[in-house]
């Protein structure tokens, strides 16, 4: 799962210094391409509706598989977003 950031660090930065983050963004390589280069199945998924079909293909394949899931950076946990943390910190 790839949200393009050091999530916990980013969360603390937004809480303590809203809107002023530093060094928490990641620019990851194409991990699915790496997997394919080594003979594995590899697929990049960045839309929710594409996840289940990709997962089903790989379960049926029965071979080593890497599924690179790209999430929105703002989705930091299942309960909150970076935007909500930033807004709460700005109100405080």
Residue ranges: model-predicted function:
Residues 1-92:
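Thiamine diphosphate
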């Amino acid at each position: 799962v790839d949200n393009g950031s050091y999530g916990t660090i980013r969360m603390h930065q937004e809480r303590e210094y809203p809107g002023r983050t530093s060094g928490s963004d990641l620019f990851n390589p194409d991990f699915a391409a790496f997997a394919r280069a080594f003979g594995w199945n590899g697929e990049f998924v960045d839309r929710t509706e594409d996840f289940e079909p990709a997962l089903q293909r790989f379960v049926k394949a029965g071979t080593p598989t890497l599924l690179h899931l790209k999430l929105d950076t703002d989705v930091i946990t299942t309960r909150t977003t970076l935007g909500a943390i930033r807004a709460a910190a700005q109100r405080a």
